Amino acid sequence: MAKGYWIGRVDVTDGEGYKGYIARNGIAFAKYGARFLVRGGPFEAPEGTARSRNVVIEFPDYESALACYRSPEYQEALAHRLPHSQGEIVIIEGYDGPQPGEG
């Protein structure tokens, strides 16, 4: 079964206010088995417009990734992010098919 992922790109406009989101999002992430694969760090954006923070979060499956976003726990955390940031989140199913160089 393919995993699910959140790909998030965010510009924080109020770091102090954003702390409310950080304090709350872990409740939903733990409930739905989330695991950070990328959480900030140095990056280069060779194409398109960059955001200052980039995150990739892995979930056990696509349905869990969707359920986490739609959960009351995450929606409560999100209410603390939206006034203090601008960004995008894409929720996507992983790929389990053949890879380059495989027979």
Model-derived features with residue positions:
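Short S/T/G/P-rich N-terminal loop/turn motif that feeds into the first structured element of a domain
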Residues: M1-R53, P60-R70, E93-G103
